[in-house]
Amino acid sequence: MVNRERMVEEFLQLVSIDSLSKKERQMADTLVQKLKAIGYEVIEDNAGEKIGGNTGNLICTVKGTKNVPAVMLAAHMDTVEPGVGKKPNIDGDYIKSDGTTVLGGDDASGVECILEALRVMKEKNLEHGDIQVVFTIAEEGGLFGAKNLDYSHIYARYGFVLDSDGTIGAIAVKAPSQNKIFVTVNGKASHAGMAPEKGISAIQIAAAAISRMKLGRIDFETTANIGIINGGRETNVICERVDIKAEARSRDKLKLEKQTAHMRECFEQAASEFGGSVDFKAESEYPSYNIPKNAPIIGILQKAAASADIELLLEETGGGSDTNIYNSKGIEAVDISVGMDKVHSVEERILIDDMVKAAEFLLAIIQNVA
């Protein structure tokens, strides 16, 4: 039922719009126009003001024609860098970037699937329950749009987030919590050539701590990483301060706590040995979610997959998304693949057939809500 040519044309338009995190104004204005052209009103919340962006989240409620639970269809408007001056091109069966920027299919492909589903529902007069469309800002780097969404407008029971790569039919039903970790290692400055004995190297403390740390893949549901290290002024000065940004993730709360405590202990022990000190702060970036196989939303997906002739793949992921936040707000939500590939790179691409198939799957989902 979806219009392939229309989807391709509109997707090319969407990914050509500059829409970096906190700078989604042009994308938001474009989507408001498109939703109004279909026949729906749009609310813009004040999330942008809260996070220092130039637009808020968009919320569009489509009243249903039958009495079934309301659903939320969600995608995010922002892209990662390099994302300015994107020039998409069709290369055979794929739409790709020109190799100098990301394509922006993360998450314009999700946005496009939602727009096309709404049009088809209207054109074909298909029955459906209430649909709440949510296009968020600043998903990349912190899920800030979803965290600051005005939930007073949201009453959907189920959420379908179109923001995942992989095979069409792949559904992320379990995702981790993440702790962002900020560490300051304090040493003592001294002349590196004339009085190194009087100094305490913060770099040496940090190196000792990290060398003892369990990092990377800890187990099947837990990971940890040291991402950013800054420190030092000159080669002839013993470094007195190092700032480190790290993270730990796990789909198990106790494992996340254990890994975070382990990283703290490594830093504190190393600082004690060398006579320095450490300031260690861990902040919860987002909570985990786990949708059981007998949850109502899984039943909806199973029926939709069968009607759309799609193999349903219930998967666990190591990444976070707006889906984590929606579940924490009481919305039973899953993350659905829309076929994006090689995301967050200049090699990003999407198979046109996959995007079309994802839109068809979304239509089937809407029609199978009961």
Where are these regions (language model features)?
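N-terminal capping segment at the start of a domain
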Residues: 1-25, 284, 341-345
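A non-catalytic alpha/beta surface segment that caps or lines the substrate-entry region
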Residues: 20-67
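Active-site metal-coordination/substrate-binding segment of hydrolases
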Residues: 28, 53-54, 61-135, 152, ...
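Acidic, glycine-rich active-site loops and adjacent beta-strand->loop/helix elements
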Residues: 48, 77-79, 134-142, 164-166, ...
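Acidic-glycine-rich active-site phosphate/pyrophosphate-binding loop
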Residues: 78-93, 171-184, 334
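Glycine/charged-rich beta-loop-alpha catalytic/anionic-binding loops adjacent to active sites
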Residues: 90-102, 184-190, 308-309, 340-344
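Acidic/histidine-rich catalytic neighborhood of metal-dependent amide-processing enzymes
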Residues: 101-176, 218, 223-224, 228, ...
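Metal-dependent amide/peptide-bond hydrolase catalytic core
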Residues: 202-370
